[in-house]
Amino acid sequence: MGRFKNNKKSRVIGKPIAKKNQEDVSHVTGDKIPKSFVFSRMKLAGPVKQLQMDLRKLMLPYTALSLKEKKRNTLRDFLNVSGPMGVTHFLMLSKTASSLSLRVARTPQGPTLTFKIHQYSLASDIAQSQLRPRCPQDLFKSPPLIVLSGFGSQELHLKLATIMFQNIFPAIDINTVKLSTCQRLVLLNYNKDTKLIDFRHYSIRLQPVGVSRRIRKFVQNHQVPDLRNLQDVSDFVTKAGYGSESEGDEEAATVTLSSDLGRVNKGATKSAVKLQEIGPRMTMQLVKVEEGLCTGGIIFSEYDVDGKKEKLKKKQDEEEEEDSEEEGEEGSEEDGEDMDEDFED
């Protein structure tokens, strides 16, 4: 007896990305706010699965944090759902026996950039390595800022990578942006010698210059400090400066605020900008660029064997042509000498 076929179409289930109080159009560019799906079309192991969740958290608030993917889901299923939900980018993790890769694609027609992940660290690994990890939930109410370093090359694949990363997060207007929304930073640094990209995710915090950690904690928490071991209240204010986690405030890392930010940082005063890594962290390499959505012509390939063979063959042909030209010149000189001898005879 044959098995009955299930004719029901497979669907991708996920919570809506945009809430009612969220804007769908950027007031800076006038275009749709970029939104993303982070998923995999295969079953991932424990650490790689957690890396996928860390990437989803990084892309908040304009992503589907609880996206449900099933084994039978195809890329077409995700594409069909992305249209009504306003999704503009796909981030797809894939794992083989020898490598881990991340594809970043623009919907619905591409292009697609494939990165080979050489090393990665989870957000939990970063937190465990820090003395005082800092990752409050309020950080993820606003999208991160994006900073690209070393991508000034004129090569086409690096230009495409620059445009892709710049458009994956909402644009900001430095004249109208609220300081309270600048809570996170994504940094991508390209090394032209190794062709590797260092991917880092930081939280941004401001500290008033010249104020000790004890005073900052007291103002922020509004809790009565423990003064049992002190002779006088002034000892609490004057004792020991910055604490183990901080260094002196460098002039280059200080800014003057235009408005109040929180309980401690007041407008028209100097504050020190502090970055603290929250993860995930990746070291990756751009290995392929495709014209379409995971398909189409290959614009760039780091492992383009056929292209390298063609270049090598072309170089060999040019060398052979040069050799033949030199031989021709030598032959003409010998013929000239023979003709002179004939005239003398």
From Swiss-Prot:
Domain Brix: 34-295
Keyword Transcription: no
Chain segments annotated as coiled-coil in the UniProt record: 307-329
InterPro entries in alphabetical order: Brix, PPAN-like
Keyword Coiled coil: yes
Domain of life where this protein originates: Eukaryota
Residue span of region Disordered: 308-345
GO terms, biological process: rRNA processing
Record-level Gene Ontology MF annotations: rRNA binding
Pfam families in the cross-refs: Brix
Biased composition (Acidic residues): 318-345
Record keywords: Coiled coil
Family the entry assigns: Belongs to the PPAN family.
Protein role: May play a role in cell growth, differentiation and cell cycle progression.
Name this polypeptide is given: Peter Pan-like protein
